[in-house]
Amino acid sequence: MNPTSTNERKVIITGIGGQGIVFLTRLFSQTALDLGLGVVVSETHGMSQRGGSVISHLKINGSDAPLIQRGSADVMIAMDPGEAMQNLDFMRRGGTVFVNSAEGLHESLAPHLERLDIRVLNHPATATAVELGSPAAANIVLAGFVAAFFILGLPYENMIQTLKQISKKGSE
């Protein structure tokens, strides 16, 4: 996928308060903007300060409507497997879910995922971040995992550059 193409990408980024969902959204949206792509972002913050649900709607080269309709997201990036399950109804047939988990999503969802041809790619981002000595960087680990698949059309090198620009620690 050419990063400067007009292909629309609808992305749901979800997790619970304190997992860096807003930062992840900023990383992806700023990278897209720096590449000259159109970006629309909308965030909902349940009781995010108390560990509640946080959902960001990110459209790259999409319509100006702020929210992604249920059944139309191309990609979901979930810092929490429970939040991924709660928000599966946003996914379109043939979409891809990236989840911070060693096991993926609960096996009871397999028939639903198979029926809709939804691909689930899991990576234990929290465990990896802890192993690297920076537990708070689990969201960045998951972002790197997503970038490796180039599914958002955002080159890894550009994401690194954006990370350095927006992160206090990224420039150290």
Model-derived features: positions:
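Active-site cofactor/cluster-binding pocket
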Residues: 1-172
